[in-house]
């Protein structure tokens, strides 16, 4: 019994400390059904940064990305104008729940990519990576700039 309690204590302590380690300012973690993946992100949180996004970049490392954050939930529409690399765009709500994943957006396209409504942000990562890692709608993210009172995975 003591061994079991010790094991549970260690497991819970590890899980909590591991989750908190994902709350550093430049890290965003995606929790999927069977795994978690940490991305090192740039933050686009003002109109100029959001307008420029990842335009004119010639490459993007796996597990790097850019997170776009908005002040209040809204309808998000993206495009790939002047973006030279294929991207996946992962749209999420204010709780950090992934609502839509657009896989393999075409470079330089001016086609509108509709994320949906009531969204607080989007994460752009290397094209087709979300499929390779098994991400799906309903998965969740942890990020230090989400409202802790609403986030499924808060940062404290």
Segments (PLM) and residue ranges:
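Cleavable N-terminal signal peptides
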Residues: 7-8, 18-20
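Sec-dependent N-terminal signal peptides
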Residues: 4-13
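Compact, glycine-rich, soluble single-domain proteins
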Residues: 20-156
């Amino acid at each position: 019994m003591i061994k079991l309690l010790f094991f549970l204590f260690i497991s819970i302590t590890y899980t909590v400390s591991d989750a908190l380690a994902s709350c550093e300012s430049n890290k965003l973690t995606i929790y999927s059904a069977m795994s978690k993946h940490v991305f090192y992100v740039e933050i686009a949180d003002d109109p100029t940064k959001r307008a420029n996004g990842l335009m004119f970049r010639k490459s993007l490392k796996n597990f790097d990305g850019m997170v776009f954050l908005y002040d209040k939930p809204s309808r998000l529409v993206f495009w790939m104008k002047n973006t030279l690399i294929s991207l996946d765009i992962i749209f999420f709500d204010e709780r950090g729940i992934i609502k839509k994943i657009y896989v393999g957006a075409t470079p330089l396209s001016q086609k509108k990519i509709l994320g949906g409504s009531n969204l607080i942000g989007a994460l752009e990562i290397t094209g087709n990576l979300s499929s390779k890692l098994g991400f799906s709608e309903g998965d969740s993210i942890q990020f230090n700039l989400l409202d802790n009172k609403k986030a499924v995975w808060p940062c404290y």
